[in-house]
Amino acid sequence: MNFKILLPICALLTLTTFLLTIIATAGSTSNYKPITNIYIGDADISKINVTKVMPQVGPILTVLGSALTAPNTTVDTIFGALKAIASTEALSPLLHLLSNAANTSATLSSLTQLAPMALLGTNTATTTTFSALDELLTTSKNTTELLDGFSTLMSSMSTNTSSTSASLENTVLTLLVDSTNPIGTTESLITLNNMTTEEKTKLSPVFELFASSKNITATCDALETIMNSTIPTSTVSSLFSSLKTSLAEGGNATETIMQLGSLVPSSLKPAVQAVVTLFDETTSQNVTLSVLSTMIAENITQSSSAKAAMGALTDLLNYTTNQTELLTSVESLALSKEAASSTNQLVALDEILSASANASTVVSIIPTLESQLANNTVLLKYVPYLFSLLAASSDPVSSFSSLVNITKWAETNAATFMPMLKILNSAVNMTTITPEQLKEMTPSILEYLHIPVIYRLSIFTMCRAHLNRTMYSCSKSHAVQNMDFRSIVYNNIEGSDFKPYMDALNIGKDDLHLDGELQDRQHMYVPAVKAALAMNLMCIITSFFLMVFLLLLSRRSVVSQKLWLALGFISCWICIFSGLGSTIFSVILNMMKSGSKKDNYDVIISGSSPFYGLMWSGFVFAVLVFLCIAYCWWSSRKGAAIVEAEKAVQESDSTTSRIIEEHESPIDAEKNFAR
């Protein structure tokens, strides 16, 4: 084919590459129509996994989504009621209550049951009760355990309303108030209370010894030593026989014991000394002898239950600040016939105190709390629902504080609160929605809240679009867009109707759980786009020069081999620039796609067909130009070889003729001359 035809064709194809690259680059750097449809890629968040990205919002959407499944309910119905309180002080506590729901069904059920209490308002007694309960929760280091214990305690109190039961409760609480170690005291009381009636009866002699003691601590230690010693029966018989004789004759029991003590083995010395202490610290040696004789006769000193009881009693005496009161109280508890209910309350108290960071403070709070609840019958019937709500919360302290704030607000804003209450009631009557159902609802919810769901990413701009892909707006052109997906999503949510709810829940940019492959790779995005943009610019520049070069050469009648090589060199670079630019942009897109897929946020990344169509078409045309130039160069080279060969033949023929002429004979020359 004539190169004069091929050169203009190559110029036209180069012009096409030039224009396609310019349009692709301009489309992805501008924000005016119609080239806004040309972009690198877009991110569709219409079905984003909200519960994963914003866990705080998950339970809220579950509640609202469940309400949406009710008959004749629309997004406007649900979120319209929520918008009505968006500017009030009730929004934050309500959202925190729902957000803290570890068990959505239990939370909803409890809230609807507690709603009448909120509408009734509060009085001084209710406020005092709430304050005490709030203080109790604040001191907790394990709120779940504390709530379980307090719930059990209240249940036990409500089922045991006898005066005896109330007296026992007061006795226990008094012991705890006087204790330097409320937890240790409670556990020791549980040990004593778990004993059978027969075992408790056997402890009566012990209390008789304490009643006649001048030093309760010394007496207790001495008894514990005796119980933990093994004394031969013969030694015991000899000891008590001598003591009876000595006391009958008006002698001193202590001296008698000391005389006998010198005759016993060293292993029994501590036990003998303990007996001496008992007689030294008593107000009546005869009473002490009688009690000890009874204890030995009934084998109390060797009883395992008695030994355990003595250990618990010793601990109680060590912890108390009033030993006399303690012994009286423990004796009354031991003689009580309501041991089972008392034990349940003690176990509940132990659970409460163990879950508290300050047991002494809790001990002072519980009597006040019990008293207020016992006297406030209106509030008392809501207590089970209150504990159910707090037990279903991941942060009971925050939930209780939120409930108190809502109660105060609803008291004076019942009309505004009622629509929201209806939504909660409708949600509690519906089956909790599944994650798949929530996913299908997400697009309509995002659209209602005016949150852009399509993000079109170009080189210098970011465009936001509705679900139907009509544009919200585009950013002004500036430096290469950063693929910081967290910032992109957060900034757009900040500009939507969802902002009040974000503020109410104190959700900041760093609270968005968008960590993963996509976010980790964002630092590679800007350098890659810059490199691709540089390739495009180089492609445009070299295409322009090649196009001009081709047009100029098309006017020549002959194109030398060197010029063809120059054309091929330039065309090769155009192919490289165009191919690299297209490849880098494709790699960027696939990088975002794979990152999004691995992160599993249900964000769909897709490329722009017009953009990649323009880029790769430009590359194909550049390759065609290179092939045409290569063909022309090859044809030119072959043509030059033929010309050289013909020239060589002509030169050879000319040389041959000259030689023949030089060797012609003189006769032939004369004949030729004659002619």
Swiss-Prot record:
Keywords: Cell membrane, Glycoprotein, Isopeptide bond, Membrane, Phosphoprotein, Signal, Transmembrane, Transmembrane helix, Ubl conjugation
Top-rank taxon, per record: Eukaryota
Pfam assignment, any one: SUR7
Glycan attachment positions: 49, 72, 103, 142, 160, 194, 215, 228, 252, 286, 299, 318, 322, 358, 375, 405, 429, 468
Entry's localization field: Cell membrane
Membrane topology: Multi-pass membrane protein
Induction, per UniProt: By anaerobic conditions.
Name of the protein in its database record: Cell membrane protein YLR413W
